[in-house]
């Protein structure tokens, strides 16, 4: 089953953790000094914040999937829309590791489709602060 993903770039992670924990009624599932993630069930959202973005606000949107088949399906949908994508196997980002595909919609909004395989000890790096495929390495992911 797919889970919608929202990643916000924030200037003050601690203040935002307090705010979103109050709004969501639960603490983050993962919390680090520069990153926090809530795996919400109602609505089914992977909501993440980090201080790693270029500017405060929506860093990117995406879909977290539960299987290789779902990742392949969404990657095919992006290709059918004639949007370039950057595929990554065993990417390390947002204290997680997994397979993912990055794309940029016609408006310039970055989209991440990913399958998480497990935790990672460091924030890591991923591409796509610029349009695909000329992206520079930088992380802003869902983990």
Region roles according to the model:
Residues 41-46, 54-56, 66-71:
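Short, charged/polar surface micro-motifs in flexible loops or helix N-caps
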Residues 2-46:
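Core segments of cupin and vicinal oxygen chelate
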Residues 1-14, 44, 60-61, 122-143:
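N-terminal beta-strand motif that seeds the catalytic metal site of vicinal oxygen chelate
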Residues 27, 46-48, 84-89:
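A short linear hydrophobic-aromatic micro-motif
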Residues 41-42, 98-101, 128-129:
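Short secondary-structure transition/capping segments
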Residues 51, 114-116:
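Residue-level structural signal for beta-strand termini and adjacent loop
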